[in-house]
Each structure stands twice: as C-alpha cells, then as structure tokens.
Amino acid sequence: MGDPSKQDILAIFKRLRSVPTNKVCFDCGAKNPSWASISYGVFLCIDCSGSHRSLGVHLSFIRSTELDSNWSWFQLRCMQVGGNANASSFFHQHGCATKDTNAKYNSRAAQLYREKIKTLATQATRRHGTDLWLDSCAAPPASPPPKEEDFFASHASLEVSGATQASAQPEPASSTPWGLETTPEKHEGGPGQGPSVEGLNTPGKTAPAEVSSIIKKKPNQAKKGLGAKKGSLGAQKLTNTSFTEIEKQAQAVDKRKEQEDLARGTPKEESIVSSLRLAYKDLEIHKKQDERLNLSGQKKAEAERLGMGFGSCRGGISHSVTSDMQTIEQESPTLAKPRRKYQEDPEDSYFSSSSKWSEQSSSRYFDDPMELRSSHFSSWDDSADSYWKKDSSRDPEPATKSTGSSDRPSSRRKPEYEPVGNTDEAQKKFGNVKAISSDMYFGIQSQTDFETRARLERLSTSSSISSADLFDEQRKQTTGNYNLSNVLPNAPDMAQFKQGVRSVAGKLSVFANGVMTSIQDRYGS
C-alpha cells in the first residue's frame, strides 16, 4: 500500500476542517487550528501543540496539517475516525473535565481513547485501503457544473411564457367587450329585445388581439385583490380640471414665498439701523460727559489712557476719579546718605568723596539737565582728569578725617602732621641740602629713634619677640574696627590698581548720570 499523494491529503483535511467542531482548538478553543494530534484524532493550535510535544510521542504524536506532507494512510484514518466532537464526548463520559494538559492526557480516559482510536483506524485501513472517504463520511454529492446562459434564449422564453399566460385566461379578457356591446343595445332597443349573439359566431382569434397587452390585465387583477379602497396607491382617473386654476395657485404660492423673504430681510435692516442709532447716542453721551467734567488736555489724555470715569459712572451714586485728579510734578529728591559699615583709611577716602561728588553732581544735573548733559558728553575724554582736580580742591576733609586711626597704637599710627606755616624757614633750613626726608622736614627723627631704642632695651632679655610686641599692638582687634588698609595688601602695584579703579569709577558715574537724565526727560514729564 503506497502513501497518499499531496492532493489526497489536502482533500481529506479540507473536508475534516469543514466540520464546525474541528474549526477550534480542542484544548484552548482558539480558532483555525493548523496542527493535529494523531493519537487522539483532534485538531490543536500551535501553542497547545508545543505542550503536547513536551508530553512525548508515547502520549501524543503531533503533526502539521499544512506543512507536513509525509502522512500515512493509518494517520489519515486516525483523523477520520476521530475528531474534536468524538474526543470531547468521550472525555466527558469518563469524567475527565480538567484543563491541565499533564493530568488530562495521563489519565485513564486518555489511555482508553488512544486505544479506541488505534483500533478503529486499523479496521478502517484494512477495510477501505486507499479510498479517500469512509462509509461514515461519504463524499459530498458533486454539484452539476454551471451552464452558460444565453441572453437571447432567456428573453425568448419570457415572451413564450407571457403568451401562454394570456391564452390560458381568455374568458375574463373577452367579458369586458361583450359587456360593453350589450349595454348600449339594451338602451337602444326595447325591453323585449335580447342580447346580441353576433359575437358567438366569430372565431376566438380576435380576443387575444385585443387582450394581448399586459397593461389591460393589471387593472383587472388589482380590482380582484384590492377592490375600491380609499387611499390606495393605484392610478386614478383624471376629472375635468382647469389648468388655469392650478397655474393661479402656483403663482399665489410664489408670491407668498417672496413676501416671507421680504419679511425676513426687514428685521436685519432694522437691527443695523438700531445699532447705528445706539452708536450715535453713545458718542453724544461721551461728548456731554466731557463738557460736564471740563477736563483740560492733559487730564483728558490721562483719563482716556487709564479708562476712568467713562461709561461706568451711575449719576449721583458712584465716585468719579477724574474729579479729584491732580498732576503731581516731581521735585528734586534728597538722596539719603548711606551709612558706613566699615571705617576707612585716609588713602581709601576716595569712595566717600566720590559719593559726595555724585550727590552734588546729580542735584546740579536735575537743576540744569541740558547744560550738564552737553558738558559731560562733549568732554568725555577729559572728564576723569578734570574731576580729580576738582575733587582735590573741593573735598579735602576725608583725607584728614579717619575714625579708625585713633584706635591704633601710637607706634604704628600715622601722626597728624601740620605743615610748616612759614615756607621761608624751610627754605633757610634745607636750602643747601640735596635730599631730605619727611622725618627731617617735620623734625620727628629724634622722637622715633628714642621710642625704638626704649622698646628694644625692654625686649632685650626675652628669647623671642613678635611684631605685636615690638610695636606695642594689641593681640586681638575689635571686629567693628577693621580698616581697608588692614584688608588690602601693601604691595607696590596696589597704587596703580587704585588709580585705575578711580578712573573707571569716575567714567561710570558720569555715564550713569547722563542715562538717568535722559530717562527722566523722556518718561518723567
């Protein structure tokens, strides 16, 4: 016995898949299963087929119904005698309703069903051999091939059938002319005359000629079925109606539509006119309010800009802001002097002097802004040099006043020297000397030498000394008495750095004053 061909396999599985119970998976119920268990003759999905493979071939032998082509006749008979419906009924009869794959196919019911499928497939193979279909599943009856329809033959058959129907019912069709012929004879003749019998001698060929049309049959059939009911959808006979009246009615309807359109258009025009009237009234109200308030030009502009006192005031109840509006002009402000947190050295007194100069310049700037602006921006390059000359002549006080210098010890404190009143004495005293020092000029050389010798003699017995011991300074200085000279290092380049800072600060102050004046001129007035 040879193996089945591919066409035989496809034909058998096509027939088996057409069964509704075989269109879903036997285990999970998924649609369109493409795998099969030969041991049980059931159809499975690809996921359930994997779980069946893990059970082993001794429990379930899996094959694909689409990919595998080496099926044997015994395997095909197993699928034919099995099926999802037979397997489910057998398992239910034996009380196996579990969903667990291992428990289900290792049960006693699964073992009995495997043996049953094997026995039935062996018997079918011996009995039918290589036949495709078994007795239980015979081949479906072959449907006859569709015949080609002839268009002209079909129309000819319709005409023949219509003629036979007309000839089959000659009596109802011929009764109508006979009745029409007898009625006038009754009116024309007397009551003794009988009906005419001329139509009886004529052959029956004339009747089909008069009743051959299908249109005359329909009223007779409609009368039989529907009768003379009111509101029917059948055709009605036209009475004597005048078309002039219909035309007049149509014209009346057209005129009515035109009138409705005109009536709809008038409210729109009225609404437009009313809106224009309201706009004019609003303008008149605003004009009256302006006349009543008597606002000047500047106050009116400010009121319009702020949106106050127009349209929202209720007469005699609410308060109008414009009645109490006053124009406030800014006077020259007095700038408060900032408090100094730290004390300064005479060397660093520039910052205090520059602040005073900026205050004076700002006040003078506000008094005459145009003159100062032109003077500042015309002499931009020379402003720093001229400023320092003015500063030295205008504000000499910070150079001599220093609040923190009194807290220093007498040894390191810079003494307040008074210049020699008479310059002739200095010229007489140092006229022939090539070089002199400040100590020689002020006569303090002997005093400093005496203090230094006394201090060294006092510390001669000590093993080590410090700078604080040498100059009699206190160990700890108070936190509030720090000076800028104690913070900044005493380096030779610090003088140049201070000079650069002073020049930059002067230029920035001049530029800031010019900017502030331009802003106040533009936005202040």
UniProtKB/Swiss-Prot annotation:
The modification Phosphoserine is found at S232, S242, S271, S275, S332, S379, S437, S460, S462, S464, S466, S467. One of its GO terms (molecular function) is GTPase activator activity. Residues 162-177, 319-333 have a biased composition (Polar residues). One of its GO terms (cellular component) is presynaptic active zone. It is found in: Cytoplasm; Golgi apparatus membrane. Coiled coil: none annotated. It comes from the Eukaryota. The keyword Membrane applies. CDD domains: ArfGap_ArfGap3 (cd09028). It is a peripheral membrane protein. Residues 10-126 form the Arf-GAP domain. A zinc finger (C4-type) spans 25-48. Residues 222-233, 349-363 have a biased composition (Low complexity). SMART domains: ArfGap. Keywords: Cytoplasm, ER-Golgi transport, Golgi apparatus, GTPase activation, Membrane, Metal-binding, Phosphoprotein, Protein transport, Transport, Zinc, Zinc-finger. Residues 160-233, 249-271, 293-364, 377-428 are annotated as: Disordered. Pfam families: ArfGap. GTPase-activating protein (GAP) for ADP ribosylation factor 1 (ARF1). Hydrolysis of ARF1-bound GTP may lead to dissociation of coatomer from Golgi-derived membranes to allow fusion with target membranes. This is ADP-ribosylation factor GTPase-activating protein 3. It comes from Rattus norvegicus. The gene is Arfgap3.
